[in-house]
Regions:
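C-terminal segment of classical bacterial N-terminal signal peptides
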Residues: 18-28
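Bacterial N-terminal signal peptides that target proteins for export
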Residues: 2-14, 270, 288
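Short, intrinsically disordered, low-complexity terminal segments
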Residues: 12, 28-29
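Extracytosolic secretory-pathway proteins
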Residues: 31-266
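Hydrophobic helical h-region of N-terminal Sec-dependent signal peptides
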Residues: 12-20, 279
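C-terminal membrane-anchoring or membrane-association module
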Residues: 283-297
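A short, hydrophobic C-terminal helix/tail in secreted or cell-surface proteins
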Residues: 268-286
């Protein structure tokens, strides 16, 4: 803990996750444009993820792998919106665009050692971060079955993906204050989460999303099927107070790490309501912070 406090004094900045990307090209993307009317789904969820903490960030000789677990911040639920009307998508089936409106998860490091118990929180949703400029986290859901198009996404299980930009806050000194050096963001690599067997709207308890890689924010299909999904490590950088990146690499996530889970699971009692006017998540962490193989998704 003393080491972490010392580090905080040295590096007074923060932000990890592609969520901070909106101050960059994220907002330029025309991908996954939402067309009203919309439906809004809310549901409880939890996460389980592993992070590789960069040596320079933790002031150690080697990177450190930590596992982080948690669930919805008390009094909140994950909220996503989706188009009500479907159109033929990448696979030629009824498809709707989706977007994380808000997600606030909280938990801590469960790996034994010097980082054990460190509280961490993360936020998803446009301008909903711990620092200004968090980008939107778009996605799509498409029917798997090649049934006749009817303008409605009503055949399940369906295929769902999201590209997430995230703010991660690690409350190192446990004072409940978001301070410089405690926030990280994935500015240039959106986290691609996938659930190829989504069972309904809202997603029922037991459904889960897995991290499968990342999509470049400049990809014209950001948030859509057909984007180039890279499976190298995902970079998280310290965020400046104004939401810009410090370019200080703090942590990474390895989507191909077979020894660590990278999941977001739906837990009981989701609800759904229709709105007129305009899915899913991932992990949280604590002070932390990558290549290029591709997957056809």
């Amino acid at each position: 803990e003393n080491m972490l406090r010392k580090f905080l004094r040295v590096f007074g900045i923060g932000a990890l996750v592609c969520g901070g990307m909106l101050s960059l090209p994220c907002s330029k993307s025309e991908a996954a444009v939402m067309t009203p009317p919309f439906a809004t789904d809310t549901f409880p969820s939890d996460f389980d993820v592993c992070l590789y903490l960069h040596p320079a960030y933790i002031m150690q000789q080697n990177e450190v792998l930590v596992r982080v677990k948690g669930s919805d911040f008390p009094g909140t639920s994950t909220t996503v919106r989706r188009e009500v009307n479907a159109t033929p998508g990448f696979f030629g089936t009824d498809t709707v665009n989706t977007e994380f409106v808000s997600m606030h998860l909280a938990g801590g490091v469960v790996t034994p050692g010097g980082f054990f118990g460190a509280p961490v929180q993360f936020k998803v949703g446009q301008n909903n971060g711990f620092r200004p400029g968090l980008g939107r986290s778009p996605g799509q859901v498409a029917e798997n079955a090649m049934t006749p198009l009817n303008g409605q996404l009503d055949v399940f299980p369906a295929n769902s993906v999201f590209d997430l930009f995230i703010d991660v806050w690690v409350d190192i000194n446990v004072d409940d204050l978001v301070q410089d050096g405690e926030v990280l963001r994935n500015y240039d690599q959106s986290l691609r989460m996938a659930n190829p067997t989504l069972r309904g709207f809202p997603p029922p308890a037991g459904d889960f999303y897995e991290l499968i890689g990342w999509v470049d924010p400049s990809d014209p299909k950001l948030g859509e099927f057909g984007a180039t999904v890279n499976t190298s490590r995902i970079n998280f950088y310290v965020v400046n107070p104004d939401g810009t990146t410090s370019n200080f690499l703090a942590a990474q996530i390895d989507p191909l790490d077979a020894d660590c889970p990278h999941t977001h699971t739906i837990t009981p009692e989701p609800t759904s309501m229709v709105l007129f006017g305009g899915l899913m998540v991932m992990p949280i962490l604590r002070r932390f912070r990558a290549g290029n193989r591709t997957l056809p998704v």
